[in-house]
């Protein structure tokens, strides 16, 4: 019994553990408010649960889903797109898509569906895109799969290995397709007219290794197909027989050969095929390989007429293993006389034989980009009578090194108007050059030039010198309408007077820091300006101009996203239209002027107040006080020279000199007085004289009167000594009041004097002669005390 319980417990624990480890399928989806749900690469092993009608798009690609049941998508009635590619789906139940009548995009590619059922697609009446590539089915089923898909526009079927058969019923019901892709790499059987049921196909991409069934397929499509692309085909054994084609009139306008292998002999078969069907205007070879030496054996070349209708020939990345043993292709020269556009790109072309150039009589456009052309061989290619109708020549990214020689070489091309020689390494530009006289367009971008000179033809209407090292553009080009000069080192816009007809200017990603309304207005005909990506200094003037000019947005095609501030530092990286600077930054001159005016007014006001309230007097008194503080508090007794220092007003000098001096200095014993007229040392600063005299006197006599308090002398010199004297709390001061003085008459700055007059006794000069003797007695007693 215990063993049974133990076993049940273990099973329960394992079950719970598996439930905990199993991911929540619905939570593995991320859906936005519009109903677009992303479940890519979430390691899902089954369809998510809980899908509702709110889901509009469901992407479950790159998971591990193997099975789709009838109920998994039942509620997704509004689903428009379902992507299930790159899973391991091997089973889809018959009614899995029954409710998806709104579905327009279905991708089931690269799964494990070995059998396809028409019941899957029957409800999908709105389907426009269906991808079934990469599934291991051998055929498209026993019954027509797509007969109900009347709105289908893009269909992709087949696989690399197992898809071996195309049946006549496979495409029944499809009348119009914009795009059909068939991977028939291992196709072994094709029932005649299997593709003929499709009445109109804009584009067919057919991947097949062997060309055995190519002509048969082409016959069925020739009257309904516009563009045929043949991929990954080995045409080395291809042979075309005219007897295999009954209908020569086709709708095919373009053939593309992509990653196709061709030999000299099979190339002849391709030429015969293109000749036998009429209407082909464009032939394209991309990433193809030519195993041969150019020894094309084309019998009855004169009978080949329809191939002459081809107007455009494009060759990109053509690989020729025996390239340096290649012939001159003279056998096909006559086939090229009516071609108007030729592109041979990245195919190691270093020479176009002169004879071939002369046969290209109708050629208007020639692109030899990314090849090995140099001036010497270009001269042979552009020989006399070569390319007589050529208007556009593209020699981008070759090995040209001299502008002067390149221009001279092309002088034979009388009708040449457009030249693209970008991505060549010219480095420098001569002062003068010769060019075809009808030149209108010149592309010199990415050629490492440092300056532009008179070598540029005056007849140009379009000039491209972008991505170089230019720091100045000062050419006079009176007919120029478009100038492309981005990714250089220009610091300002070109001079508009040199470009009077300019309509388009693209000058982005230079070193421009600003431009003004005046500069733009000088370009009278300018319609388009692209100047983003520069290091703009967002000054107040620049911001005002760009933000207030509403019409500027119509001219600046990259406004506002590419216009960012580089300085000031606090707005770096912000869009110009969003930056707002402070008043102090925008009106600095006015602010400084205002501050200077305010400072001047403050100084002026200070002077007025100082004069009005005797501020200078207070300052000078403070200075004197500080000077006095640094001296000893009291002079030594041996330095005392006077009994008293007399401080008085000049208006009271008569009383002092004729009465005070006579009564004191002629008394027995005499008193020695210090008078400023008599005892001050000439040449010595008056303040020092005053302070020294007070310090060398035992007493200081102040002769107070109305004249004293009004005297400039007292106001600005003598009262400095009063300040120090009273500050020492000494009794050395003797006050003589010559005449009654009201306290209101004493200025506020004589605060110490006012205080002493309130706290100390002073001597009053009597007007009565009988009382004067008592006055002198009291004075002499005060001096001796």
From Swiss-Prot:
Function noted in UniProt: Cooperates with LY96 to mediate the innate immune response to bacterial lipoproteins and other microbial cell wall components. Cooperates with TLR1 or TLR6 to mediate the innate immune response to bacterial lipoproteins or lipopeptides. Acts via MYD88 and TRAF6, leading to NF-kappa-B activation, cytokine secretion and the inflammatory response. May also promote apoptosis in response to lipoproteins.
Cytoplasmic side: 611-785
Record's comment on post-translational modification: Ubiquitinated at Lys-755 by PPP1R11, leading to its degradation. Deubiquitinated by USP2.
Organism: Canis lupus familiaris
Pfam families on file: LRR_8, LRRCT, TIR
Gene3D superfamilies membership: Ribonuclease Inhibitor, Toll/interleukin-1 receptor homology (TIR) domain
Residue stretches of each LRR repeat: 54-77, 78-101, 102-125, 126-150, 151-175, 176-199, 200-223, 224-250, 251-278, 279-308, 309-337, 338-361, 362-388, 389-414, 415-437, 438-457, 458-478, 479-500, 501-524
Membrane topology, as annotated: Single-pass type I membrane protein
Annotated TIR domain residues: 640-783
One Gene Ontology term, aspect cellular component: Golgi apparatus
Gene: TLR2
Annotated GO MF terms: NAD+ nucleosidase activity, cyclic ADP-ribose generating; signaling receptor activity; transmembrane signaling receptor activity; triacyl lipopeptide binding
Keywords (A to Z) from UniProt: Cytoplasmic vesicle, Disulfide bond, Glycoprotein, Immunity, Inflammatory response, Innate immunity, Isopeptide bond, Leucine-rich repeat, Membrane, NAD, Receptor, Repeat, Signal, Transmembrane, Transmembrane helix, Ubl conjugation
Protein name per its UniProtKB record: Toll-like receptor 2
Motif ATG16L1-binding motif mapped to chain: 762-779
Cross-linked sites for Glycyl lysine isopeptide (Lys-Gly) (interchain with G-Cter in ubiquitin): 755
Cysteines paired by S-S bonds: 31-37, 354-383, 433-455
Signal sequence region: 1-17
Residue ranges of domain LRRCT in the record: 525-579
Segments passing through the bilayer: 590-610
Disulfide bond in keyword set: yes
Residue positions the entry lists as glycosylated: 115, 200, 246, 415, 443
Family to which this protein belongs: Belongs to the Toll-like receptor family.
Complex and partners: Interacts with LY96, TLR1 and TLR6 (via extracellular domain). TLR2 seems to exist in heterodimers with either TLR1 or TLR6 before stimulation by the ligand. The heterodimers form bigger oligomers in response to their corresponding ligands as well as further heterotypic associations with other receptors such as CD14 and/or CD36. Binds MYD88 (via TIR domain). Interacts with TICAM1. Interacts with CNPY3. Interacts with ATG16L1. Interacts with PPP1R11. Interacts with TICAM2. Interacts with TIRAP.
Domain of life: Eukaryota
GO BP terms, alphabetized: cellular response to diacyl bacterial lipopeptide; cellular response to triacyl bacterial lipopeptide; inflammatory response; innate immune response; toll-like receptor signaling pathway
Extracellular side: 18-589
């Amino acid at each position: 019994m215990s063993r049974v319980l133990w076993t049940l417990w273990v099973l329960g624990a394992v079950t719970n553990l598996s439930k905990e480890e199993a991911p929540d399928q619905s939570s593995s989806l991320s859906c936005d408010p519009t109903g677009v749900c992303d479940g890519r690469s979430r390691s899902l092993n089954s369809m998510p649960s809980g899908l509702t009608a709110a889901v509009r798009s469901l992407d479950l690609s790159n998971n591990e889903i193997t099975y789709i049941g009838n109920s998994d998508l039942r509620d997704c009635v509004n689903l428009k797109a379902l992507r299930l590619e790159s899973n391991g789906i091997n089973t889809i139940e018959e009614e899995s898509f029954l409710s998806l009548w709104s579905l327009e995009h279905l991708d089931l590619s690269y799964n494990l569906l070995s059998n396809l059922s028409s019941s899957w697609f029957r409800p999908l009446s709105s389907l426009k895109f269906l991808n079934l590539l990469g599934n291991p089915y051998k055929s498209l089923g026993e019954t027509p799969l797509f007969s109900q898909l009347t709105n289908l526009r893009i269909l992709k079927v087949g696989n690399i290995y197992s898809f071996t058969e195309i049946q006549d019923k496979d495409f029944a019901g499809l009348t119009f397709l914009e795009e059909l892709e068939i991977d028939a790499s291992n196709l072994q059987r094709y029932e005649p007219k299997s593709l003929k049921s499709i009445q109109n196909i804009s584009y067919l991409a057919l991947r097949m290794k062997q060309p055995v069934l190519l002509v048969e397929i082409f016959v069925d499509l020739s009257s309904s197909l516009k563009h045929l692309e043949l991929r990954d085909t080995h045409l080395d054994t291809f042979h075309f027989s005219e007897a295999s084609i009954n209908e020569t009139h086709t709708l095919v306008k373009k053939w593309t050969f992509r990653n196709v292998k061709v030999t000299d002999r099979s190339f002849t078969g391709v030429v015969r095929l293109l000749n036998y069907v009429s209407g082909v205007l464009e032939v394209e070879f991309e990433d193809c390989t030519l195993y041969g030496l150019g020894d094309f054996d084309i019998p009855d070349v004169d009978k080949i007429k329809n191939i002459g209708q081809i107007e455009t020939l494009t060759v990109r990345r053509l690989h020729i293993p025996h390239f340096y043993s290649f012939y001159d292709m003279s056998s096909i020269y006559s086939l090229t006389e009516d071609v108007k556009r030729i592109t041979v790109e990245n195919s190691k072309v270093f020479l176009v034989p002169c004879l071939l150039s002369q046969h290209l009589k109708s050629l208007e456009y020639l692109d030899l980009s990314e090849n090995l052309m140099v001036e010497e061989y270009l001269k042979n290619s552009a020989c006399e009578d070569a390319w007589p109708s050529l208007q556009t020549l593209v020699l981008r990214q070759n090995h040209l090194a001299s502008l002067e020689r390149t221009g001279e070489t092309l002088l034979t091309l009388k009708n040449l108007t457009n030249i693209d020689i970008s991505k060549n390494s010219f480095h420098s530009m001569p002062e003068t050059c010769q060019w075809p006289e009808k030149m209108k367009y010149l592309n010199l971008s990415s050629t490492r030039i440092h300056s532009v000179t008179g070598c540029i033809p005056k007849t140009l209407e379009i000039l491209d010198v972008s991505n170089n090292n230019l720091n100045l553009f000062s050419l006079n080009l009176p007919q120029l309408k478009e100038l492309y000069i981005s990714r250089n080192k220009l610091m300002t816009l070109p001079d508009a007077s040199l470009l009077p007809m300019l309509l388009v200017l693209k000058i982005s990603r230079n070193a421009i820091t600003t431009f003004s309304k005046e500069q733009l207005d000088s370009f009278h005909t300018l319609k388009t300006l692209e100047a983003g990506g520069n290091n703009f200094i967002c000054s107040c003037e620049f911001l005002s101009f760009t933000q207030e000019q509403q019409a500027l947005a119509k001219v600046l095609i990259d406004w506002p996203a590419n216009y960012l501030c580089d300085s000031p530092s606090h707005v770096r990286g912000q869009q110009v239209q969003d930056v707002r600077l402070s008043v102090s930054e925008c009106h600095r001159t006015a602010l400084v002027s205002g501050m200077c005016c305010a400072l001047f007014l403050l100084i002026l006001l200070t002077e007025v107040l100082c004069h009005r309230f005797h501020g200078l007097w207070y300052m000078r008194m403070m200075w004197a006080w500080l000077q006095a503080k640094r001296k000893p508090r009291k002079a030594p007794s041996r330095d005392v020279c006077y009994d008293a220092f007399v401080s008085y007003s000049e208006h009271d000098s008569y009383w002092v000199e004729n009465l005070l001096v006579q009564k004191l200095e002629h008394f027995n014993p005499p008193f020695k007085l210090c008078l400023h007229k008599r005892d001050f040392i000439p040449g010595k600063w008056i303040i020092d004289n005053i302070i020294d005299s007070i310090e060398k006197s035992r007493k200081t006599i102040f002769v107070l009167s109305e004249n004293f308090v009004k005297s400039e002398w007292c106001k600005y010199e003598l009262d400095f000594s009063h300040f120090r004297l009273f500050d020492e709390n000494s009794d050395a001061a003797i006050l003589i009041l010559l005449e009654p003085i009201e306290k209101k008459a004493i200025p506020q700055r004589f605060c110490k004097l006012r205080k002493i007059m309130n706290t100390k006794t002073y001597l009053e000069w009597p007007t009565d002669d009988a009382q004067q003797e008592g006055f002198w007695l009291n004075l002499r007693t005060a001096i001796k005390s």
